[in-house]
């Protein structure tokens, strides 16, 4: 049993870099990231569920096989939360394996849901489609909607190369930049409405900007409802946004107008938010000055947000978000110390209470005291120094006259890292044990 436990502790070396990348994905906006233990929990759980796949290497093909099998399982009522966490963690690992870098777990699930169209019914329908349309692969190299030679249309998920190119443009130039708008308008001409909105949601960018974009899309939808009363040949908002449609239905010719309207709404929203960003008085440009108190900064910020022509929920979101992101470094550190992990969701009043003393003489004296506090260096000698070897004050461990003691075997003359007894056990190069644990989400 001891040998078996030692072998399991080795983990999954072929996924070392993948797990490292997965640990950068957040459970949600502003929340904690996944841990190595979360990833190991998911992988070990999958090995227990599908024992026939346990010996196979963790390739992307195996991950898609596991993903398809998990979709066919129905968990018990008491295990639904753990099952949902298992699927979400696997989606994050799959994205990292493919080289993608989603910001949140929800974004990773969206990426996999987009790409799984390539794998649905692949074995059952692949040969038949190739026989009917031998030139299909040549025509559907890039675009999700493909015109077939025999008539009709087929759908293919957005290529990862195109998705990564859009991600790069969004990171370099900004989500609402003209460069990103041009790239999106070029590629999205043959995307379904669902493709357009999902790709936009998974792009990196300022959360406040994304909230403003969503607000502009809602305004366009409300304007469409007012100007187009329900009728037999009138498109509904759900049809335009691709709600309740399969990918095959959304790719047909009768949905061309809906896709064009959806793309135009998205471009209009991007331009509106971009114009807001460059307009004087834009809330996202209101930042706390070095000599400005947090209360004065909040007063300017709230005034700018209240002047924006957006809905109340968006105003509330901007107040909660920008009151932290646009604050000074000292105020952000103070809020982190006082409010902890919920700093992004805390109210403006709580943040003002946390920063009430920032900038005062007492706060400056506290910072000065921390900066001048001895850090245990060789130049700082005093009675408060304590030797970790003999436990007596007045000197450091390297100055101790009693000699070096090994904390592993208790003998003198060598340190723990050089202990021969430790080397004989074969554990000298192993790091701390990572305990598999379910991710705290869903």
From Swiss-Prot:
Please report, in chain numbering, the residue ranges of the motif PTAP/PSAP motif.
436-439
Keyword Transport in the entry? The reply is no
Keyword set includes Repeat: yes
- Give one GO term, molecular function aspect: nucleic acid binding
Site positions per UniProt: Cleavage: 363-364
Q: Which SUPFAM superfamilies match?
A: Retrovirus capsid dimerization domain-like (SSF47353), Retrovirus capsid protein, N-terminal core domain (SSF47943), Retrovirus zinc finger-like domains (SSF57756)
Q: Name one GO biological process term.
A: viral translational frameshifting
Q: Segment Disordered: which positions?
A: 420-442
Q: Where are the zinc fingers (CCHC-type)?
A: 385-402, 404-421
Q: In which domain of life is the source organism classified?
A: Viruses
The alphabetized UniProt keywords are: Capsid protein, Host-virus interaction, Metal-binding, Repeat, Viral budding, Viral budding via the host ESCRT complexes, Viral release from host cell, Virion, Zinc, Zinc-finger
Q: Which GO terms describe its cellular component?
A: viral capsid
Looking up InterPro entries in the UniProt record yields: Gag_p24_C, Primate_lentivir_Gag_pol-like, Retrov_capsid_C, Retrov_capsid_N, Znf_CCHC, Znf_CCHC_sf
Q: What is known of its domains?
A: Late-budding domains (L domains) are short sequence motifs essential for viral particle budding. They recruit proteins of the host ESCRT machinery (Endosomal Sorting Complex Required for Transport) or ESCRT-associated proteins. Nucleocapsid protein p14 contains one L domain: a PTAP/PSAP motif, which interacts with the UEV domain of TSG101.
Q: Could you say which protein family the record assigns here?
A: Belongs to the Ovine/caprine lentivirus group gag polyprotein family.
- According to UniProt, the name of this protein is Gag polyprotein
